[in-house]
Amino acid sequence: VFFAGP
């Protein structure tokens, strides 16, 4: 899973 916030 990949998550990138602002």
From Swiss-Prot:
Keywords recorded for this protein, A-Z: Toxin
Post-translational modification: Processed by the macrocyclase-peptidase enzyme POPB to yield a cyclic hexapeptide. POPB first removes 10 residues from the N-terminus. Conformational trapping of the remaining peptide forces the enzyme to release this intermediate rather than proceed to macrocyclization. The enzyme rebinds the remaining peptide in a different conformation and catalyzes macrocyclization of the N-terminal 6 residues.
Record carries keyword tRNA processing: no
UniProt-recorded Gene Ontology molecular function terms: toxin activity
Crosslink position(s): Cyclopeptide (Val-Pro): V1-P6
Family to which this protein belongs: Belongs to the MSDIN fungal toxin family.
Function recorded in the entry: Cyclic hexapeptide that belongs to the MSDIN-like toxin family responsible for a large number of food poisoning cases and deaths. Cycloaminide B is non-toxic to mammals but shows immunosuppressive activity, probably through the inhibition of the action of interleukin-1 and interleukin-2.
Protein name: Cycloamanide A
Organism per entry: Amanita phalloides
